[in-house]
């Protein structure tokens, strides 16, 4: 009678051990399958909250990086337009120097003026047509804010149409004594505008590096918290399988032993 009772007491313990092994096997199998140490809140309540926060920061940084890349592209387009205009103005300077040659006749000067007028028309076209996503970049003064994380970078666009007109560039008489002054003033103005866009792009590049570093660090931290240690998970899975097999064997032996006792008692 005492032996039967011991068997009855041991059987629940074996069942409990088997259940624990089953649960651990299920957990480790899920970790191996998903590659994640945390698959539900109950796995690590504190860890999952930290992981969620890191994921949010990574996603916010991704949005910021897209904004920064758009801003950088905008600055590059503007600088490309200014570079094209500057090349044309440099050609105007060369033509103006030629026009100062006292050996030229009127026909020569008219030919040079025609070349200058064509260059000026091209400059005005470039000023009006340089744009990004439908926004004109060179003929309207305004501030374009690029939001990235908690901060923002401002790109200032110039009104080159009026600024160059104020320099007398678009009414340029290539043979006049003050033509070079107008041209040199225009070149200085263009250099300032190009420098402003280059400065904004440098700021955006710095922000991009900062956001990228932050995202990498956050991703590594999240990985340490959430990712499964595959070697450890595989080892624990093997251990759980062995424990499960042992529990099943012990349960079978306990059931067989109980059956023998009951058979003896029934005689």
What are these regions (language model features)?
Residues 43:
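Short beta-strand/loop segment that forms part of the nucleotide-sugar
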Residues 217:
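C-terminal catalytic core of tyrosine-transesterase DNA break-rejoin enzymes
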């Amino acid at each position: 009678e005492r032996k039967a009772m011991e068997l009855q007491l041991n059987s629940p313990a074996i069942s409990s051990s088997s259940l624990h092994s089953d649960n651990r096997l299920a957990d480790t199998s899920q970790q191996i399958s998903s590659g994640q140490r945390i698959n539900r809140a109950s796995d690590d309540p504190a860890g999952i909250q930290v992981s969620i926060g890191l994921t949010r920061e990574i996603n916010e940084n991704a949005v910021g990086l897209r904004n920064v890349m758009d801003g950088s592209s905008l600055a590059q387009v503007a600088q490309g337009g200014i570079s094209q205009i500057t090349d044309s103005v440099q050609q105007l300077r060369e033509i103006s120097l030629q026009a100062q040659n006292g050996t030229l006749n009127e026909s020569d000067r008219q030919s040079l003026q025609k070349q200058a007028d064509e260059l000026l028309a091209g400059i005005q076209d470039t000023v009006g047509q340089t744009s990004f996503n439908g926004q004109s970049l060179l003929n309207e003064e305004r501030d374009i804010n690029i939001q990235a994380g908690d901060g923002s970078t401002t790109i200032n666009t110039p009104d080159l149409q009026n600024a160059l007109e104020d320099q007398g560039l678009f009414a340029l008489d290539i043979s006049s004594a003050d033509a070079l002054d107008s041209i040199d003033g225009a070149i200085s103005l263009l250099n300032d505008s190009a420098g402003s866009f280059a400065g904004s792009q440098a700021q955006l590049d710095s922000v991009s590096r900062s956001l990228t570093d932050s995202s990498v660090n956050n991703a590594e931290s999240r990985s340490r918290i959430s990712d499964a240690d595959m070697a450890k998970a595989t080892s624990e899975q093997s251990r759980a399988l062995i424990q499960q097999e042992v529990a099943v064997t012990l349960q079978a032996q306990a059931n067989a032993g109980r059956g023998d006792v009951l058979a003896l008692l029934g005689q």
